[in-house]
Regions:
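Secretory targeting and sorting signals
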Residues: 1-38
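Catalytic cores of phosphodiester-bond hydrolases, prominently lipid phosphodiesterases
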Residues: 39-363
Length: 363
C-alpha cells in the first residue's frame, strides 16, 4: 500500500503549547504524585501514549548503581550502546570502549540478583537484567529498549542480524514485543508490512503490554562516521525483515529498525531502496529538530512511534540534568502534545527526575 500522505502541522501551535503547559500545571502534577498507572490505559494503544526515559541509562553508574535502579524510577525507556567486539564476537555495552563493557549491568539468574554483583557485563546481561526486572514487575508499563549499535553488526557469525534476533529473543524471552506481534491481525493473518500494521493501529493495547519490552535499534556514531549509509543497521535490518517475511519466518525477528534524524516530510524518503520504507515505523530524532519539523502530528496520526532525545534542548532550553519539576513536566507535556511517543532525558537528578514515571496521552 502507498505510504501515508503528510499532514500539515495543526494550526494554532501556540494554543497547543499553552494547552500542554496547562496540562502540566493542572493534570500532570497530580499524575506525578499519583502511581504511574493513574492514566486509564484500557482505552489506549501503545502508540497513543507518551512516556519519559533515560538517555544512556547503562552509563549513569553514579546515579544508578545498577540498571535495575534506573528501572525502579518508572522510566518508560532505557538506552544501551553496543559494540560488536571484533576480537571475541561478543556484544559489549559501553559509551566509547569498543573492546570492553563499561556499564551498570550485572550477571543475574533471577530477579533477586539484579541489585548485586559485578557490573560491566555484556549485552546479554543487560537484557537479562531488564527481563528479570519486568518479571518482578508484571504490571509495569511497557519499556522501550533503545539500542544504539555503535559500530553496527559485526563480522562474526554471532553478530549477524539473524544471530542478534536469537540473542534478543533468548535474553528477553517471554517479555519482548516483536515485529510479528505488530503484523499479526486478530484473525491470525498478517499485514503486508509494518507500515500497514502501524497505520491500522495494530499495536497492542497499552494495558495488555504491561511487563513487556519493545526494542528499537539505531545506527551508531562510529558506524555513521566510517561506513556507507547503505550498510548501516537500519537498512541492513529492514532488508532482513523483508527476507524473513518473504520466507515465512517473520516470527524470528526481535527488534524494530528506527529511522534516525528528523527532516521535513517523511524521513523514510531518504532510502533510495523504496522497498525498505514500509518496514520503518519507529523514528528517533532530536527533540529540538522534531518540534521544528513542522509536521509532528504526522507521526501520531499514522500511529508511528517517535522517540525524541535531548528534551531540554527545545526553546527555551532547560537544564540538561536537573530542571525544576514544573519545567520538566511542562516540557514532557509539550512534546507529548507534539506527538512524541518517548521523551529521552538526562534528568536523573531531583527534582527533575520526578517526571520519569509519567505516562501521558499523546497528541
Amino acid at each position: 500500500m502507498p505510504l501515508p500522505t503528510l499532514l500539515t502541522k495543526r494550526a494554532g501551535s501556540r494554543l497547543l503549547a499553552a494547552a500542554a503547559l496547562l496540562l502540566s500545571a493542572v493534570g500532570v502534577g497530580a499524575a506525578a504524585a499519583a502511581p504511574a498507572h493513574a492514566l486509564d490505559y484500557s482505552s489506549y494503544h501503545l502508540a497513543g501514549v507518551t512516556g519519559t526515559g533515560l538517555h544512556n541509562t547503562y552509563d549513569d553508574k553514579a546515579e544508578y548503581t545498577y540498571l535495575a535502579n534506573a528501572l525502579d524510577t518508572g522510566t518508560s525507556l532505557v538506552e544501551l550502546d553496543t559494540w560488536a567486539n571484533a576480537l571475541n564476537g561478543k556484544w559489549d555495552v559501553s559509551h566509547s570502549d569498543p573492546l570492553a563493557s563499561v556499564n551498570n549491568c550485572v550477571q543475574a539468574s533471577s530477579s533477586a540478583d539484579i541489585y548485586t554483583g559485578d557490573r560491566n557485563q555484556n549485552l546479554d546481561s543487560c537484557l537479562d537484567d531488564i527481563r528479570y526486572w519486568l518479571l518482578a514487575h508484571p504490571t509495569s508499563h511497557p519499556i522501550m529498549v533503545k539500542i544504539e549499535m555503535k559500530n553496527g553488526f559485526g563480522s562474526w557469525s554471532s553478530q549477524s542480524p539473524t544471530a542478534f534476533d536469537t540473542y534478543v529473543q533468548t535474553h528477553l524471552s517471554g517479555v519482548v514485543y516483536t515485529p510479528a506481534d505488530l503484523l499479526t491481525k486478530s484473525d491470525g493473518s498478517l499485514y503486508p508490512n509494518l507500515d500497514a500494521a502501524a497505520t491500522a493501529n495494530n499495536w497492542g493495547n497499552y494495558a495488555s503490554l504491561e511487563g513487556k519490552a519493545i526494542v528499537e535499534i539505531i545506527p551508531g556514531t562510529y558506524e555513521q562516521a566510517v561506513s556507507s549509509s547503505s550498510t548501516w543497521v537500519d537498512q541492513v535490518y529492514a532488508q532482513h525483515l523483508i527476507d524473513l517475511y518473504n520466507s515465512g519466518e517473520i516470527s524470528q525477528a526481535a527488534v524494530f529498525p528506527s529511522v534516525l534524524g528528523a527532516q521535513t516530510g517523511d524521513p523514510r524518503l531518504r532510502y533510495s531502496n523504496t522497498a525498505l520504507r514500509p518496514w520503518f515505523v519507529v523514528f528517533d530524532q532530536d527533540a529540538g529538530a522534531f518540534v521544528s519539523d513542522g509536521a509532528t502530528e504526522w507521526y501520531n496520526t499514522n500511529h508511528y512511534l517517535a522517540v525524541v532525545t535531548d528534551a531540554y534542548d527545545v526553546t527555551p532550553a532547560l537544564s540538561s540534568s536537573a530542571p525544576s519539576l514544573a519545567d520538566a513536566q511542562a516540557r514532557v507535556a509539550l512534546l507529548a502534545a507534539d506527538g512524541a511517543s518517548y521523551v529521552s532525558t538526562d534528568w536523573y537528578n531531583s527534582p527533575g527526575d520526578g517526571v520519569l514515571s509519567e505516562v501521558l496521552p499523546r497528541g
